[in-house]
Amino acid sequence: MAYSEEDFLQLSGLQHFRFCRRRWALIHIEHQWAENYRTIDGAILHENAHDTAFQERRGDRFITRGVSVYSAELGVSGQCDVLEYHRGAAGIPLSGKEGLWQPYPVEYKRGRPREDTVDTLQLCAQAMCLESMLCCDIPEGALYYGEIRRRERVSFTPELRAEVRELLVEMHELYRRGYTPKVKPTKSCNACSLKELCLPKLMKSRAVSAYLRAAMEESP
């Protein structure tokens, strides 16, 4: 199945969806947004990474930024923060460049590495889009974390690719229905920029601050 362009979802929404389905729906279906220091800090970090005019050659590495990607099969479109091309026999030809070059997407994140797949899903989806666009295989990429100023290598395993596909199918279905799901609040809600928009709708008879305190006490 191939999605039409008007049905494409934002690729960056994968991270929101994996973190909290309700948060994703509030942003992408209800078009609600609120800033906190985390979102502002993250926006600043991405500002330089999305400089589409930037190109640089460092030895056997060619670096570009803000590269648009899409996949009709997945029904998403978005941008790679940084797309590097590493010279190698398994790569692809690039116009005006000698040899073969392996695409290597790099995504910028503000914090530290996570134990779940919230961050890696978005990067993997970028790679899957690039594979479709460039007719090549991309086995890995990297996440750069601003807090530790270091890259973490990410392998695009069959399991990670399957999770990307499964979540996108669910996202398309919710978007088609225009449905904002309810979720069980947790201590993670305390750091969410949308908590004052989200929680009052979930807890009509209870103060948000009181609910958050209870959720934090109940969570391990």
Residue ranges of model-derived segments:
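Metal-dependent nuclease catalytic cores that hydrolyze phosphodiester bonds in DNA/RNA
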Residues: M1-P105, S205, A214-P220
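Short, intrinsically disordered, charge-biased short linear motifs at domain edges
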Residues: S4-D7, E170-T186
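Structural motif
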Residues: L9-Q15, T117-V118, T180-K187
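Alpha-helical structural motif
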Residues: Q10, R21-R22, Q122, L160-L167, ...
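Cysteine-cluster motifs in flexible loop/terminal segments that predominantly coordinate metals
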Residues: C20, Y179-P220
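Alpha-helix termini
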Residues: I29, W33, I148, A191, ...
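Nucleic-acid nuclease catalytic cores
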Residues: S77-G78, E84-G178, N190, L194-E196
